[in-house]
Amino acid sequence: DTSTGSASVDWHATAVTLTITPSATSSKILVSFDGQVYVQNTSGDAGIALKISRTIGSTTTSPDALHTKSAANYSAHYTQQTYGQFAFRAPLSGLDSPNTTSEITYKLYFIPYNVNGAGINSMNGRSTLTLMEIDGS
């Protein structure tokens, strides 16, 4: 359960993480997240964006294929004019090309906007992160 009490300009790390070691440098990794997100607000629009980072050794990156925020685009967004507290599914998947046979750790992050509270797996939610190696030769 990861949550924050306010809107932010920073990405929040979650406990949703998984590791895989590809068998070939040409392998692709299908990364698939399906989970419950939570947002709460007292007025106006509110939303949440997701991204999955990739760590190989000591280098962490956020591949474009695993990112839902582009300018004002958020993966899960709702509009409301009065107090609201909502939990809903927010899937994210992408095909990564890490070009390595070293261990890779994928980790979910979120960033909320215009909220009093937001999080992943709040309100008894569950999330899954699935990694599948695909032959890239």
Map each language-model feature to its residues.
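Extended, low-complexity regulatory regions
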Residues: 16-18
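Short, solvent-exposed loop/turn segments enriched in Ser/Thr/Gly
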Residues: 12-14
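Terminal beta-strand-rich extracellular "head" domains
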Residues: 1-6, 10, 21-103, 107-137
